[in-house]
């Protein structure tokens, strides 16, 4: 009988110890991280992944989840109700449209950085190209540009060629792609002889050379704006992230990748 009482006493003590430690364990439980969904233009992929490392180190309660694609594709996804918190585009016009459609919160808009539009060829190319106007030459057979309906760099490219009066001669040579990264890839592999991309996309490849920069005034200013998506459930955290992008810390990373601060 004493043996039975001893066993029961031990079990009771164990139960009391377990119950007593439960609140403490609950208090020590790791708080759930805020998941921030950022829809961003594909040309920003490298720099934003770098920024993510720094941002999450400074904000351990936040986990950033990126969706990279052509600006127009992302715009359509958000318009169809895709869950997103932040939208960063490669053109002011796209953001203007989003504001007008009330798909983003207008007063959270931040104009982040600028970029240049450049003409690229393969380093092994024998083409004698020195300017965008040279794309009209007969020796150039195929020119890669982003599809203007969804890729801002593609629309900028057409703007430049119309400005120079050569679009009618170049449009038959134009190979339209789903994004600027594909344009770069096509030039690297020889699928096209030349391509038009953002400067920051060109300089990440060691197989290409920049032969010309679009003349000033030949296209609208290239600005990369960001804003909080209207249906975001993390609007405060989203705006804090946008503030970081335009902060000195964020701008330092952007400049490392070739982007220019806005003047």
Predicted region positions:
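Periplasmic-binding protein-like
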Residues: 85-89
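Exported/periplasmic ABC-transporter solute-binding proteins
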Residues: 19-56, 72, 76-80, 91-92, ...
């Amino acid at each position: 009988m004493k043996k039975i009482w001893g066993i029961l006493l031990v079990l009771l003590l164990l139960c009391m110890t377990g119950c007593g430690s439960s609140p403490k364990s609950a208090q020590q439980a790791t708080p759930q991280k805020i998941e921030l969904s950022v829809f961003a233009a594909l040309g920003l992929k490298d720099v934003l992944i770098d920024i993510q490392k720094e941002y999450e180190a400074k904000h351990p309660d936040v986990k950033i989840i990126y969706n990279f694609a052509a600006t127009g594709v992302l715009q359509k996804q958000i318009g169809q109700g895709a869950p997103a918190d932040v939208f960063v585009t490669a053109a002011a016009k796209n953001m203007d449209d989003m504001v007008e459609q009330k798909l983003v919160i207008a007063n959270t808009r931040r104009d982040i950085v600028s970029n240049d539009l450049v003409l690229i060829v393969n380093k092994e190319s024998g083409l004698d190209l020195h300017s965008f106007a040279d794309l009209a030459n007969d020796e150039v057979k195929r020119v890669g540009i982003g599809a203007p309906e969804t890729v801002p760099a593609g629309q900028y490219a057409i703007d430049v060629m119309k400005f120079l009066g050569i679009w009618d001669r170049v449009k038959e040579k134009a190979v339209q792609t789903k994004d600027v990264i594909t344009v770069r890839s096509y030039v690297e592999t020889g699928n096209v002889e030349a391509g038009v991309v953002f400067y920051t996309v060109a300089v990440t490849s060691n197989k290409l050379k920049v032969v010309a920069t679009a003349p000033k005034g030949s296209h609208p200013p290239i600005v990369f704006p960001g804003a909080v998506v209207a249906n975001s459930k993390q609007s405060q955290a989203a705006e804090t992230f946008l503030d970081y992008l335009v902060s000195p810390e964020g701008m330092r990373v952007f400049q490392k990748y070739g982007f220019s601060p806005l003047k």
